[in-house]
Amino acid sequence: MTSNEELLQNYCSILFTYKTIGISNLHLYYFRETEIKSLRQLINAEFAILQTCNRVEIYLYSNTNTISEINKMIQYLNNVHNEPIGNQARVICGKDSIKHLFLVASGADSLSIGEYEILSQIRSTIDMFKKLGFSGKYLQILFERAIKVGRKVREETSISKGKVGIYSLAIDEAKRQFNNFYDRKIVIVGAGEMGQKIANMLYNEGVKNVTIMNRTVEKAKQLALKFGYNYEKLDLDKLGSFDIAFISISHENLRLENKWNTLIVDITVPPLFTGNNVITLEELEKISKLNFKAREEELVKINKLVEDGIDELIYDYKKEIYSEFMSKIMKRVETIRENEIVRAYKELEKLGINNQQVKEILDLMTRSIIKKSFQPLFDNVRSLVFDGENSINYINFLIDIFKDGNIPIFETKKIKKKQISKRSSS
């Protein structure tokens, strides 16, 4: 492991994905809103949870002990579920954690290879957890870089060329089974996000004979009117009167048999329907992988772009550390400067000097002295941060010095030990 890679060891992730636990089991691992909020009292780290139909992934950053926070998170999951589901998690840290997120953002790790939707999901995740106060600047720079890598991969490779999204694949598979697809009678069961996307795609395809079914008929009506479609209250017994049914509703582990000749494309997790003439997400995943086989050479390019992205993140990370150092130093120095100006002016007043211009001159003079005195230090620190082998150790030491004006005894011993070791090795 290089010294630069060591900088990233504060990043870790806990992963449950369609690859490790199966698409049909993934819903058991989703976090409820109340569970997410209760984590605030437990976890002493930045964290964000990426939840999609492909994955539940927890990303953490801690500058103290990330492994300890991971153990607390896994114990919490075990307690909530009353079983050791943490044993099924894949836990990775440092470069491995970052590389995984970048591959996710690129679409290379998706159930539907190359899909675009993951980028908006990553964006909404970090925005939500920032708003909740759970993520901070270090997860922010990680997720921002992941989004940039995802966009670059799509610009410079053909991973997203053609129809790659789950919804596109679902419609294409239905079209493949019907020669006269556009004349078929179609129903969309569910007016949520998935139902809306399918309705929009069918509309763009020029399909006219579509009905929206939903538990809340008003929501079905709103979606139907948007595209000029029909709408009805949810009634699964009526599915037999349609040629094709796209299923996108939540349910409590129901399993129904397809007893009609209707082609059912079930994109719920877990699937609602079983039997003949049913296409599930797992089948669409297989189709997606077959489609990507012809573009496997793109993986070499993608991995190169991901590695470049990791190097760029290291730069982002160092830049953030340097900015934090500068801020802490200058905040301390500015407090001292302002106090000394007040003290000096009081002494001048005792001598009968009470002039606003003198105060302004003192202000300008002290600012100039600080700038000229500290610039060489800042230049050297910048060099250590971006080029030095042990940059983090030096920065933490300097921050401790300026925290209270004294060098802690423990830090002094540590620095002396390093200096002796360095001289010995030389």
UniProtKB/Swiss-Prot annotation:
Question: What's the subunit arrangement here?
Answer: Homodimer.
Q: Which family does it belong to?
A: Belongs to the glutamyl-tRNA reductase family.
Role summary:
Catalyzes the NADPH-dependent reduction of glutamyl-tRNA(Glu) to glutamate 1-semialdehyde (GSA).
Query: Its catalytic activity?
Result: (S)-4-amino-5-oxopentanoate + tRNA(Glu) + NADP(+) = L-glutamyl-tRNA(Glu) + NADPH + H(+)
Query: By its UniProt entry, which HAMAP family does this protein fall under?
Result: Glu_tRNA_reductase
- Binding positions for substrate per the UniProt entry: T52, C53, N54, R55, S110, E115, Y116, E117, Q121
Task: Classify the source by domain of life.
Answer: Archaea
Question: Which Enzyme Commission number(s) are on file for it?
Answer: 1.2.1.70
Residues that coordinate or bind NADP(+): G190, A191, G192, E193, M194, G195
Q: Print the miscellaneous field.
A: During catalysis, the active site Cys acts as a nucleophile attacking the alpha-carbonyl group of tRNA-bound glutamate with the formation of a thioester intermediate between enzyme and glutamate, and the concomitant release of tRNA(Glu). The thioester intermediate is finally reduced by direct hydride transfer from NADPH, to form the product GSA.
The organism of origin for this protein: Saccharolobus islandicus (strain L.S.2.15 / Lassen #1)
Q: Per its UniProt record, what PROSITE patterns does this chain match?
A: GLUTR
Say if the entry is tagged with keyword NADP. Answer: yes
Q: Which GO biological process categories is it annotated with?
A: protoporphyrinogen IX biosynthetic process from glutamate
CDD domains under this entry? NAD_bind_Glutamyl_tRNA_reduct (cd05213)
Cross-referenced Pfam families: GlutR_dimer, GlutR_N, Shikimate_DH
Give the record's keywords alphabetically.
NADP, Oxidoreductase, Porphyrin biosynthesis
Active site (record annotation): C53 (nucleophile)
Pathway annotation? Porphyrin-containing compound metabolism; protoporphyrin-IX biosynthesis; 5-aminolevulinate from L-glutamyl-tRNA(Glu): step 1/2
InterPro entries the record matches? 4pyrrol_synth_GluRdtase, 4pyrrol_synth_GluRdtase_dimer, 4pyrrol_synth_GluRdtase_N, GluRdtase_CS, GluRdtase_dimer_dom_sf, GluRdtase_N_sf, NAD(P)-bd_dom_sf, Shikm_DH/Glu-tRNA_Rdtase
What does its UniProt record remark on the domains?
Answer: Possesses an unusual extended V-shaped dimeric structure with each monomer consisting of three distinct domains arranged along a curved 'spinal' alpha-helix. The N-terminal catalytic domain specifically recognizes the glutamate moiety of the substrate. The second domain is the NADPH-binding domain, and the third C-terminal domain is responsible for dimerization.
Q: What is its EC class?
A: oxidoreductase
Q: Name one GO molecular function term.
A: glutamyl-tRNA reductase activity
Cite the position(s) of the site with description Important for activity. H100
Give the protein name, as stated in the record. Glutamyl-tRNA reductase
Please state the gene responsible for encoding this protein: hemA
Its taxonomic path starts at: Archaea, Thermoproteota, Thermoprotei, Sulfolobales, Sulfolobaceae
